[in-house]
Amino acid sequence: MEETYIDTLDPEKLLQCPYDKNHQIRACRFPYHLIKCRKNHPDVANKLATCPFNARHQVPRAEISHHISSCDDKSCIEQDVVNQTRSLGQETMAESTWRCPPCDEDWDKDLWEQTSTPFVWGTANYCGNNSPASNIVMEHKSNLASGMRVPKSLPYVLPWKNNGNAQ
């Protein structure tokens, strides 16, 4: 039994192609060869069915039900299904012990207790006092000296902006 199992895993083992009996293919290349040969022999491909447990098994359509009941790879799949259903039955979700940490902040309360109005750019700032500085409207400041402005175009001409002239 052990030799048979090792023999099926040997990547250098030669396998016979189900589409062309003259083809002997190494096991490691067999899946690729099956795809190629299936395309080259559509008449034979229509007569064969693929095993649902191992795509390397190409069986005549009349014998597929017998093959499914006796396929060696079926036991691996069935064992996986059994193990999966057992593990699902044993797994129970542990109830979370996480608790929200205590919080001293109340942002809603802070908003209502706030005495000053929020800062808005370009509007008068009324902070409760009537000083002349508090009634000044904020203006946009520039780092340029007065009388200077930012250039409206780049100092060079980009190749794709050549005023529509083709080169």
Swiss-Prot record:
Show the SUPFAM superfamilies listed in the entry: beta-beta-alpha zinc fingers
GO cellular component assignments: piP-body
In Pfam terms, one family for this protein is zf-U11-48K
Q: Which GO terms describe its molecular function?
A: tRNA binding; zinc ion binding
Can you tell me which residues bind Zn(2+) 1? 17, 23, 33, 37
Principal location class: cytoplasm
Q: Which parts of this protein are zinc fingers (CHHC U11-48K-type)? A: 14-41, 48-75
Keyword Cytoplasm assigned: yes
| Protein name stated in the entry | Gametocyte-specific factor 1
Species of origin reads Bos taurus
Q: Which gene encodes it?
A: GTSF1
